[in-house]
Each structure stands twice: as structure tokens, then as C-alpha cells.
Amino acid sequence: MAQTTVTVVATKRDALDPYIKILQNRSNDIDVSFSSYLKPDNNEQQQKENEDTELSIFEARSYFSENGSNDSRCQTRNLSGPRFSSVASAKVSSFTVGQTASSEASWNSQTGLLSNKNRQGSDRDGRRSSKKGPRWFFRRRACPCSSSKSVQVQESKPRIAVPKTGSDRIVSNRIVHSHQTISSPEPIRLTIPSNTVTRSIDYTANKEARAPVSNFSFPTLNETSQLSENPKNPVLNHIKPVRIEPALLPIKPVLNPTSPKGVIIDEEATSDASSDLFEIESFSTQTAARPWAPPVRDSMEETVSEYGYEPSEASVTWSVMTAEPASAVAANFSRIALSSSSTAFSGYDKKRTGLLNCHCEKAVMVNGDKRLVQPVKSVGVQNDVAGKVLCNNGSSKLSVTSRPRQ
């Protein structure tokens, strides 16, 4: 049997997978010299020789088996692509061959070890993932719902609004009642002696409502609430006011002193009342007694203080409403300013007399330099004459004197 030499050559393609080529050189058939490569050979013979000399991995294993049988025919197979096999690399490394084969086999063994490590890591990951499943289903400790960090939320009951009790309402009513009681002014006293002709009405002095005048002043009553004990008997009646037009020049009222009704003049007020402008507002029990009346200046003191005692070249608006159109009683006063709001007097059940039930026969309206006398359709003549007196203590007294009808 001819002597053969086997050379294991491991080459790297793309630095990934080696493959082994087994070359069987026969001294008789193959020329090993360098010149032999320069000689042209037949292609068919070379292909056959290559097929005979190239062996696959499995054929090499069977070739180097312990039996040592050489009966099997050597076959060569061309490997078209790279092939990786850790088992083959491990087997090749155990071969007892030359230095070149051992170095290549050692490199192959390293790649095999690396691949085995990767396989072990993947196996461990698979085992871990397989262990997590039964722990989740069969062990409640691993469930996050029952761990110490779990949070349990309980549904809170909706808040129910507590209705207000009767005590709260009583307290609020008390507060309102106390507020109304504090804001109410003092009542006005009415003194009417029985079986007498002269009746007097005393008004308390109101220091805050007084307007400063050079000579003297009268108090102005504020709006007061109804304080009557018998509300069914209204004390005041409506007096239709006269529409007032502004006058270009201030004119003093000219009244007829020869009135058939007579005149009562108070001695205390005759000194200063003859030269003062005045205005007597209507007496009413309701605030809506004269809704159409234009706004009238409440006091003449502003004009007096600005232009002196007797204003000149100032527009003055004034009107006269008295019990008698030709009466000179109103000329004795500077001003009678009473509130047009509802005012009730307590303890009055007698017959209404005086200015409280006064309907004027005629009304005087002054416009410029002319004096117009305008009759009123609804006329109720009373035999009463009013007079207002300034007292020393600062309070005013309104005296009503009854006279027989003529």
C-alpha cells in the first residue's frame, strides 16, 4: 500500500466559520514540484483529482476511525457556503496532526466554547422565564396585589348636605328684627286736648336736620316709618300739588290781607318772616302722592348764603300752598319743610281738622312777574288756619285753630 500524507487545512471565510480540507497526495500520481503547476493539464483530470482529494468533515471522521479500513471510496464535496459547527471544531481539535492543524483547531475550540457559553446563557434565561410562570400562578407572595407596597382604595360615601334647622332661621330673623328696631326714629307725639278749639302738635327738635340760617332756622323732619297704633284711620289726606315753573326773578308773595276767613299773626315771627322766601310742601300719607311733580329744591339757604340775605339774579322756584289763598299766615315764616313720606300719628281717633284734612279752594302759582290764580276742581273748604311758631328751645310748634264756617 502506498504511503499517503494527510494535511488538515482550516481557512476562514469572512472571519466566521472555518472548514477543513483534507488533501491526499500520492507521490506517484501527483507532482509536488513547483514546475508542475506551470504545466498545462487536462481539466477533466484535475477535476477528478480534486474530487478525490477533497473530503468532507464526516468522511474524514470515518476515514480516521479505529477500524482503519480503506475500502470506502474517497469522495470530495465542494462546500458552497460557510458552515459553522461547534461539534466538528471540537473533534478536529483532538486530532494528532502537525503544528498548523493544532493552531487552527485551538482557534476552533475557542469559537466552540463561546458558542457553548451563549447556549448556556440562553438556557438559563429560558429556565428563569419558565420558573416565573408557576410562581405567578401558584405563589401569592409574588403577586404585587398582595405585597407590602400594594394600595387598597375604599370607596368613600358621598357627603349629604345637612338642612338648616329652625334655630338658625330664628337667629337670622332676630338679627333682622334688631336691625329694623335700631334704624327706626323716635315717634312724633300728637297732643289733642278734648273739648277745646285750639290743638297743638309738638315736634321734637332734630339737631342734625337743621339748616343754618343767618337769623333763625326750623328743623326738617326726616322720612319716618309708620308707627300708628290704629292703622285703619289715616291721619293725612292727599293735597294735589301745583306744577311749578322756574321764575326768572325772585318775587315776594303778595297776599290779600282782607280775607273773609281772617288772619292770625304770631308776634314772635313777624319781624323776620316778611322778607323770607318760603315753600310749604303738601301733606301726604303715601310717598306716591305726587309722582308727576318736578324736583324742587328743599331749602333756600344755599341761595341765601351765596347771594346774601336777598338773592338777586338767581333762578328761584317756589310755591304757596296754604289753607286760604289770600291768607298772610305763611308770610310770617321762613320755611315749613315737612317730609312727603308717609307719617302716622298715634292716638288720633277724633274728627280730622286743620291742615291734616285741608283741601285748598285755590292755589297760587307764581311765574315771573305775574301772579296766576288757578282753581282746583276737587275743593274741600275747611275753617282752619295754620300757624308755625319758633320756640326758644329750638323745637317748632304747629298750632291749628278752628274757625266757624262763614
From Swiss-Prot:
One of its GO terms (biological process) is phototropism. Belongs to the PKS family. PKS1, PKS2 and/or PKS4 are essential for phototropism but not for inhibition of gravitropism under long-term blue light irradiation. Expressed in the hypocotyl elongation zone. Not found in the root elongation zone. It comes from the Eukaryota. Residues 106-133 are annotated as: Disordered. InterPro entries: PKS. PANTHER family: PROTEIN PHYTOCHROME KINASE SUBSTRATE 1-RELATED, PROTEIN PHYTOCHROME KINASE SUBSTRATE 4. This is Protein PHYTOCHROME KINASE SUBSTRATE 4. Interacts in vitro with PHYA and PHYB. Keywords: Phytochrome signaling pathway. It comes from Arabidopsis thaliana (Mouse-ear cress). The lineage of its organism: Eukaryota, Viridiplantae, Streptophyta, Embryophyta, Tracheophyta. Induction: Down-regulated by light. Modulates phytochrome-mediated control of hypocotyl growth orientation. Involved in PHYA and PHYB signaling. Acts as an inhibitor of asymmetric growth. Not involved in the control of leaf flattening.
